[in-house]
Amino acid sequence: MLGFRSPIRLCKLSALGSAPLLPISRPKLFSTAVARYAADMETVNTTERLARLRQLMQEHKVDVYIVPSEDSHQSEYIAPCDGRREFISGFSGSAGTAIVSMTKAALSTDGRYFNQASKQLDSNWELLKRGVENVPTWQEWTTEQAEGGKVVGVDPSLITASGARSLEETLKRNGSSLVGISQNLVDLVWGKDRPAPPREKVRVHPDKFAGKTFQEKIADLRKELEKKKTAGFVISMLDEIAWLFNLRGSDIPYNPVFFAYAIITPTKAELYIDDDKITPEVVAHLGQDVVIKPYNSIFADAKALSEARKQEAGETASKFLLSNKASWALSLSLGGEEHVEETRSPIADAKAIKNEVELAGMRACHIRDGAALIEYFAWLENELVNKKTVLDEVDAADKLERIRTKHDLFAGLSFDTISSTGPNGAVIHYKPEKGTCSIIDPDAIYLCDSGAQYLDGTTDVTRTFHFGKPTELEKKAFTLVLKGLIAIDTAVFPKGTSGFALDALARQYLWKEGLDYLHGTGHGIGSYLNVHEGPIGIGTRVQYTEVPIAPGNVISDEPGFYEDGKFGIRIENVIMAREVQTTHKFGDKPWLGFEHVTMAPIGRNLIQPSLLSDLELKWVNDYHAEVWDKTHHFFENDEFTRSWLQRETAPITK
């Protein structure tokens, strides 16, 4: 699935001599209990909503109001009740910030969503294309609107402490100010139509899948806190809490997390969660090691904890550790910048390095998931080509989900399946909706980006097929993308190398043609957790320079190419970083490489063998032989699918 983006300028393709436009993505059921939460691409009339919001802004003496995408835990993907930015703007993409002044409104988003936002925003809104030359950032636009001593308001629980400080400093320079408004104004506009917060039960994630008890994880965390000489760690990121306590939930579609906070000190472990989500199994699991407290008491408790610490030790009191992604509201409750140490979360770092049990689970679940994909693509080709069945993009995506449910340890989808035909493949984060989506054209490129949650791991795979006769242009573009995927897969690099440094390997063959793609090359992946997981990744984000790739990291490898209005190409495998043996060891340091775990054929009729080196062609044939070896036993009683797999994994020659 497409992860994080790169600030690259858009351009058109002409006979593979210029450059491309956007990529794609579509969300789906996290479990059968979760209804689809997606809007179609139609424009939403926001006139009345904006009028009501501006009335509330006047009442609260605010001239400009910021509406972030995130929830109180800074989640990338959110529950329906937290879709405030979508409600006020009509834009349903996962990333973006809305800003409303008394006379104007703007929506800032990145290159994955330019196409979508331009279709969904009505005439009340200005689209700020992030990363495009001469287009202001949302902070710059806000500052301009606030000139002359105006007041900018924001819900302090929805913006990071560092983000608030940075904006506050910028506003001060032109005589303006930033204020936190605890009552969210968009919620007031939304009123009774706002979806209710989720109330799903929390589940224990067994140690046989986690590979480590939660007591061991907390002990390791306390060692880190001792090294940093901090008073404790206040945790707000949902996937970090789920990972730390070996618990899973269903509060956010596709992400097995639950709304909670936690505080870990040298002597206490406290979990803040609504009582109605706790089962006897969870109580028994946590035992005497964890105190369960009400979710809404976190801010009062954090304030009391900070004040008690100051009274005991005065000005020499050690600070509380807080993630640099934690909210402004949480930072203020701990006494603000002077009393907290904001840093990259030590839990994020630990979670990103999978243990041997988690790595084994990743290998196993990707083989089962590969079998599901093989059955699906064999079925799809047969329906489209042989039976001439009329299928739309949602029909196909639903079939894939049904196939996945048959496999062991399946627990839902990891994101909404991106099932896209022809030009829809060139739309970043494309969302097909029943009634408005396209009929799949067997004579056009079909791009499918999908993933699943299994109790032993999380999958994310993209395959691009053509069930007819692809053009030479399509084959050349596909092969250039494939060469980039192979370059990452076969990379060998010294310990300490970042994903930022590796990114160019995937783009080099497109760059030689003057081409590129508007998204990162890879993102971290959780173990039965979020399909997008930091802090590691492969791309041009500054954050990727901060954390080097390490053994145990699980990352996607997904270069692409997109010709707006025509087709999209992306090939995605999940890879795991590991130590490799090299002839030499320059600098006497370990050297790393990758192990791929995704097991699904790569569209062979789109490959132009003459563009592959001998080593690249060997990689393709070796990979397909591995796919056959690890998956063909699933089809002992399914001769049709077995024959399709045999054909698709047969050796390719020049």
From Swiss-Prot:
GO terms for cellular component: cytoplasm. Disulfide bonds: none annotated. Mn(2+) 1 binds at D460, E558, E572. Its EC number is 3.4.11.9. One of its GO terms (biological process) is proteolysis. It catalyses: Release of any N-terminal amino acid, including proline, that is linked to proline, even from a dipeptide or tripeptide. The keyword Protease applies. It holds the Pfam family Creatinase_N_2. Keywords: Aminopeptidase, Hydrolase, Manganese, Metal-binding, Metalloprotease, Protease. SUPFAM superfamilies: Creatinase/aminopeptidase, Creatinase/prolidase N-terminal domain. It comes from the Eukaryota. CDD domains: APP (cd01085). InterPro entries: Creatin/AminoP/Spt16_N (IPR029149), Creatinase/aminopeptidase-like (IPR036005), Creatinase_N (IPR000587), Pept_M24 (IPR000994), Pept_M24B (IPR033740), Peptidase_M24_C (IPR032416), Peptidase_M24B_aminopep-P_CS (IPR001131), X-Pro_aminopeptidase_P (IPR050422). PROSITE patterns: PROLINE_PEPTIDASE. GO terms for molecular function: metal ion binding; metalloaminopeptidase activity. It is an enzyme of class 3 (hydrolase). Binds 2 manganese ions per subunit. Its cofactor is Mn(2+). Mn(2+) 2 binds at D449, D460, E572. PANTHER family: XAA-PRO AMINOPEPTIDASE 1 (PTHR43763:SF6). Catalyzes the removal of a penultimate prolyl residue from the N-termini of peptides. Belongs to the peptidase M24B family. This is Probable Xaa-Pro aminopeptidase P. It comes from Neosartorya fischeri (strain ATCC 1020 / DSM 3700 / CBS 544.65 / FGSC A1164 / JCM 1740 / NRRL 181 / WB 181). The lineage of its organism: Eukaryota, Fungi, Dikarya, Ascomycota, Pezizomycotina. The gene is ampp.
